[in-house]
């Protein structure tokens, strides 16, 4: 079941990953993530990379 939240983009084009999403998505401070934009679906995806 998808988890959805609405977030606001800051003036520096930053967004905060909402708590509901973080609970389902094992990301922590310092992790590297890859942001992917799918032009066909107009969807942004986040992929966790190996920690440095």
From Swiss-Prot:
GO terms for molecular function: DNA binding. Disulfide bonds: none annotated. It holds the Pfam family MazE_antitoxin. Residues 4-51 form the SpoVT-AbrB domain. It comes from the Archaea. InterPro entries: Repressor-like_regulatory, SpoVT-AbrB_dom, SpoVT-AbrB_sf. Keywords: DNA-binding. This is Repressor-like protein SSo7c3.
């Amino acid at each position: 079941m998808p988890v959805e939240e609405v977030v606001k983009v800051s003036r520096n084009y930053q967004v905060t990953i909402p708590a509901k999403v973080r609970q389902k998505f094992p990301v922590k401070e310092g992790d590297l993530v890859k942001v992917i934009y799918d032009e066909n679906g107009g969807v942004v995806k986040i992929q966790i990379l190996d920690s440095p």
